[in-house]
Amino acid sequence: MTIKILPARLANQIAAGEVVERPASVIKELVENSLDSGATRIDIDIEKGGAKLIRVRDNGKGIAKDELGLALSRHATSKIHTLDDLEAIMSLGFRGEALASISSVSRLTLTSRPAAQEEAWSAYSEGRDMQVKLQPAAHPIGTTVEVLDLFFNTPARRKFLRTEKTEFAHIDELLKRIALSRFDVSINVRHNGKVIRQYRAAKNQLQTEKRIAAVCGNAFVRNMLRIELEHQGLKLHGWITTPDGARQQSDLQYCYVNGRMMRDKLINHAIRQSYEMSLKPDQFAAYVLFIELDPHQVDVNVHPAKHEVRFHQARLVHDFIYQALADALAQSSVIDKPQVNESAFHRAEPEERESQPETTPQYSPQSVSTTVPERVYQAIDKTPTYPGRTDYEIKPRDRAPSDSSVREARIADSFKRTDWIESKLAPKPNVGKERHAEPAPSKREVHAYHELLKTPDFESQQAEQPTSIESVREVSLPQVTALGKALVVVDEQFVLMSSDSGVALVSLPRSEFYRTKGQLTPSEGALKAQPLLVPLSMKLDTDLVRLAQDYQQDFAQLGIQLKARNDKALMVMGVPAPLRQQNLQNLVPDLLSYAQTWMKGEKASTQMLPALIDWLAVQVTTVKSHYTLSEAIQIIAELEQLRHGQLPLDDKTFVSAVDFSATIAKLKP
């Protein structure tokens, strides 16, 4: 067989074997091109898992008409021109193979318009020699690449595609990695015409954490630690989880080198080594880490799909990552964790609880519980039982109660529950053994808290050095005018804040109540109602249906859309976002019954809306047993945003000034 130069299409199809493995590979190349073009918004349309259609549209710089033909040619790129450029590459793409390879195994159309060009042009290649054809098109500034019928001309490749669900799962995982690498870019994904993912651009810390939660889950955000370290031009930043956030599989491990997503053995080894003493053999660390260094110190051109890199100073990078993560984990383990008490799942009767001896959990820094069930045990174990509460008493029933009697009992209990939650949101008194099953804090927490808040013992000072009664003056705490910066969580329920006006202690349960109330309070017009996919129909008493009709506008102000089917049936068409996860089958009838009770009390109808907001806030607010500093910061930030900076600083159950003058005087020599 004689030696011949391969036709352009065949050569590109061979190259596509390395570049285009599956639909996710196509999207990776196209989205990376969009990011390199400076796009801030990327819209991705997919059909049949990418086998039928892949369309990627961006608002980047675009491609001039004269360069469209070159864009579909092999080894044509605007990102490098010399070997020095390759050694200092910072863009995601640089080989100039992607578009040519993709167009050789699909029907590809490239449409683009730069800002300096009044009209857009489309380019596509056809024939054995892949001649590029141009035609005018309508398109905004930016670029759209449409890929139809992937592998239509290579049946051997097409038959190896998996199911639509599997291929889309690969695409979804890829886009999660890209979404974490560029928080400043909005990414929208539609599959078969349905919006699947919407990653909005993050402009502040709260929005950044929301995107992390959207990709990694809320459990990751609850247990994450912020990492930021720089040494000799090597920078590491991102988030890792404490051992409490460990996973049963390595599905939340994202690492980036100079913005490029990586799976590098050196980096993985350093991370595993830093967690060696913290995780069990069947547990995996979860992290989102970014490594930045001089591009001359890393070679990115060592893998066909650019999944691996090679560091010139591999040992330095390895030890730097290991030390940074090991130090962060060591600092996070200062707060001791309680061991799990599984007996909390087996709730005793009130008489049994009173007869059981009171126990204090044992604490050990090494006994860090990490699995999801164990964290549930911890949460239940730390939930106190309250004297006189009969919520959990189980009493025999002679007959099943009617719906109306159940509702009346629930409404009566809701008034009691309002008082109970108000008391729980208020600062906790020192009730000692009255706390019953609530576990005691660790010795270190008790000591730190007492050192923070204790005042000098005036009686002992008077015994040692007698003074007149007039010399002892009552200390009046200053008025809190601003919250400022969160410093530390105290007693798991309060956060210490520092501002120019002084130091104050803020109740986090009370903050959660005000945050929920702010979410339920209309600010500019009515709350936005989110339509239910399936309207909820319920049978009610005639008077409740009539009440819903008479005060339909009031409920609409709260974002609750009610529609009467007849005089004994009501339909819930939509509710505001804070109520979407509630049991509407119980909540809506209870709300109507509460409103009816309010009106029977001869209250002014104009005052009913604030009363309903307060009632709903009490029902929706979930009080946690303990808070982390990141959760406290998020709660305060959202509260300030909802109330436009007008915080309830006059509420003594929400915030109280802390006076250190007596402690400072005691410490002075």
Swiss-Prot record:
InterPro entries with a match to the protein in the record: DNA_mismatch_repair_CS (IPR014762), DNA_mismatch_repair_MutL (IPR020667), DNA_mismatch_S5_2-like (IPR013507), HATPase_C_sf (IPR036890), MutL/Mlh/PMS (IPR002099), MutL/Mlh/Pms-like (IPR038973), MutL_C (IPR014790), MutL_C_dimsub (IPR042120)
Alphabetically ordered keywords of this record: DNA damage, DNA repair
GO biological process: mismatch repair
The family this protein is said to belong to: Belongs to the DNA mismatch repair MutL/HexB family.
Provenance organism: Vibrio parahaemolyticus serotype O3:K6 (strain RIMD 2210633)
One function term, GO molecular function aspect: mismatched DNA binding
The UniProt record lists the keyword Iron: no
Annotated Polar residues bias: 357-372
Gene Ontology cellular component annotations, sorted alphabetically: mismatch repair complex
UniProt name for this protein: DNA mismatch repair protein MutL
Compositionally skewed regions (Basic and acidic residues) per UniProt: 344-356, 390-408
UniProt region (Disordered), positions on chain: 343-408
Function description: This protein is involved in the repair of mismatches in DNA. It is required for dam-dependent methyl-directed DNA mismatch repair. May act as a 'molecular matchmaker', a protein that promotes the formation of a stable complex between two or more DNA-binding proteins in an ATP-dependent manner without itself being part of a final effector complex.
Record's keyword annotation contains DNA repair: yes
PANTHER family, per the entry: DNA MISMATCH REPAIR PROTEIN MLH, PMS, MUTL, DNA MISMATCH REPAIR PROTEIN MLH1
Entry superkingdom: Bacteria
